[in-house]
Amino acid sequence: ESPVYVYHVTGSMKAFLDHYGYRWMLHRPEESMFHKQAVCISTAAGAGMKSTNKDMADSFFYWGVPKVYKYGVRVMATSYKDIKPKIKAKIEKDTNKMAYQIKKNAGHVKTGIKTKICFYFMRMLHTRGWDEADLAYWSKKGWDREKRPWKNNKGV
């Protein structure tokens, strides 16, 4: 979750996402992420929720997360106590609906074609000597050969 800050995530969220940059598919992805779901939530007094959620969703995609939910809400306030009850009720309803979907899909998410294509492209870079440390990780996992992180591992 991140409040909108100049149409993007806050500095602390950006630092968190950057800290895990080494887990991007190009480097050393955690195979359990290929079986998870993620939620991006952003709030703003005005606008910018879409681009803020995209910042977070991009990292989830490159971590291999197959299902990402996004929820942005204009709260028209700068503190929780100033949010109108009608908006709070809508948030409650929307997030309950999202939670239901997450529970329903738990253990059943599948890696999509876009992620698989991206993975194969990253694999091609590694087989051409992209980075020694990353290649050693991929090789240890068998991903430079026939194994794939979304197969035979529920990782939950």
Regions from the PLM with identified roles:
Residues 66-156:
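Glycine-rich phosphate/pyrophosphate-binding loop and the adjoining helix
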Residues 1-72, 138, 142-150:
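Helix-loop-strand module that forms the ligand-binding subsite of alpha/beta enzymes
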